[in-house]
């Protein structure tokens, strides 16, 4: 009787371990069979050159139309060029999406070399770039388009999440599914110091701009996880230094739903002193393993102008 009872207890344990070993063996086999993966993102992800190199991201630039010329974002035009042109001509650029043929030309060499390609784009509410990538994926096998539902380093968080999973050996299909879910957890917002660029771009009236300047109002632009739509969530009042501290406190203080591995401070051209104020405010309210400081590219810069700054992180 004693041996029989022990046998009954022992058998389920053996079965459990056998099933577990078989499961992980199968997963290991799946990972081993997975094709090598090339990670691609459009130029609006605003990752630093160091992070682009670390994650081996292949960047495909959006087009920037300024004056009578068309440029490649981040290649032959940068935010300071936009600011200089605006000061002289009071004209802002217009960005143009990457089309399907451009995507196909960009990814085909990687696919023909035997790779899968994960391509992450700016939010679909902000550009037709994602739709172009989706249409390209219908023409070829092995291309996995992901709508970041964001912009700037909110989008950059999504790229890094994909890069982490590529490094872990996951297959492309699984990465695409997991990362698409993460896009709903990215929290991105920016403080705008001056409404001049928003007014010039048709995003606020002259009256609103004048009132904001007189009252020293600084709007917080928040990015929705529904395609990356942007809207005003709160209007702060006071000097920029004071507003930035209050803004960081509003985003971080007392929260327990934030992933604390990394956070971005992303700006469109601002003083080192103000970056230091924001970094100190972050450290006051929450510990992050990494605080990345990056310069926003042409998209955010042409919308909001200089002295725009945001913190961007991921919720659990």
Go through the PLM ranges and name each one.
Residues 8-32:
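Short, Lys/Arg-enriched N-terminal segments with co-localized hydrophobic residues
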Residues 11-13, 20, 123, 197, ...:
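Generic low-polarity alpha-helical segments
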Residues 35-36, 44-54, 58, 63, ...:
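Mixed-charge interfacial surface used for oligomerization/domain docking
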Residues 39-40, 94, 119, 145, ...:
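Short catalytic-loop micro-motif centered on adjacent basic/acidic residues
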Residues 70-139:
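Class I S-adenosyl-L-methionine
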């Amino acid at each position: 009787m004693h041996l029989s009872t022990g046998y009954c207890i022992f058998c389920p344990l053996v079965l459990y371990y056998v099933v577990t070993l078989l499961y992980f063996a199968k997963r290991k086999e799946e990972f081993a069979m997975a094709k090598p993966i090339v990670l691609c993102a459009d130029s609006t992800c605003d990752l630093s050159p160091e992070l682009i190199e670390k994650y081996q991201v292949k960047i495909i630039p959006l087009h920037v139309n300024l004056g009578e010329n068309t440029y490649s974002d981040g290649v032959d035009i940068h935010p300071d060029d936009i600011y200089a042109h605006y000061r002289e001509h009071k004209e802002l650029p217009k960005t143009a999406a990457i089309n399907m043929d451009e995507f196909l030309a960009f990814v085909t060499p990687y696919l023909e070399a035997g790779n899968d390609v994960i391509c992450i784009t700016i939010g679909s509410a902000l550009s037709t770039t994602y739709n172009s990538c989706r249409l390209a994926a219908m023409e070829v096998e092995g291309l996995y388009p992901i709508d970041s539902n964001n912009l700037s380093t909110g989008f950059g968080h999504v790229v890094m999440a994909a890069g982490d999973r590529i490094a872990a050996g996951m297959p492309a299909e699984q990465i695409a599914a997991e990362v698409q879910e993460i896009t709903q957890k990215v929290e991105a917002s920016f403080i705008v110091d001056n409404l001049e660029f928003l007014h010039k771009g048709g995003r606020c009236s002259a009256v609103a701009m004048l009132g904001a300047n007189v009252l020293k109002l600084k709007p917080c632009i928040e990015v929705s996880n529904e395609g990356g739509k942007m809207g005003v969530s709160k209007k702060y009042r006071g000097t920029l230094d004071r507003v930035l501290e209050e803004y960081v406190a509003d985003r971080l203080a007392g929260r327990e739903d934030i992933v604390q591995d990394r956070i971005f401070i992303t700006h469109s051209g601002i003083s080192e002193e103000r970056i230091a104020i924001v970094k100190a405010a972050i450290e006051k309210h929450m510990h992050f393993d990494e605080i990345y400081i990056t310069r926003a590219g042409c998209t955010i810069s042409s919308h909001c102008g200089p002295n725009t700054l945001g913190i961007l992180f991921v919720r659990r």
